[in-house]
Amino acid sequence: MIEIQAPVDVVPSIYPVLARRRGHIVHDAPKPGTPFYTVKAYIPIMDSFGFETDIRSYTQGQAYCIQIFDHWSVVPGDPLDDNVVLHLLEPSPPLALSKDFMIKTRRRKGLNEVCVYMYVYVYVCICMH
């Protein structure tokens, strides 16, 4: 869950940032007694890295956000599916999200991309002994 507080005049620049990061707005309303507007949204953890920097740059530093873990949700697709082809700098289709998330996580941790055949080979070798 992300809660964003911003002056009313910069709120329209928040929505495209959320959309680019697969955000889903659950509540947006003015904050009573203040000149601020509150936007609450769900955003995948994988897309939350650097979100605050983007919000601040798109609103000229006038918005701030709080990120709080809210819930787990199953990501569609199979992360080991070799039929899924991911293209650089393009959003992944819904059934390729699990593979996209896995590859991004492995790259961020300095690991190479996983190969399904490697796991099948290791599993077969272990089972045969």
Language model segments and positions:
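Accessory interaction regions appended to the cores of large information-processing enzymes
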Residues: 1-119, 129
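Cysteine-centered motifs
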Residues: 125-127
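Intrinsically disordered, low-complexity Ser/Thr- and Pro-rich stretches
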Residues: 121-123
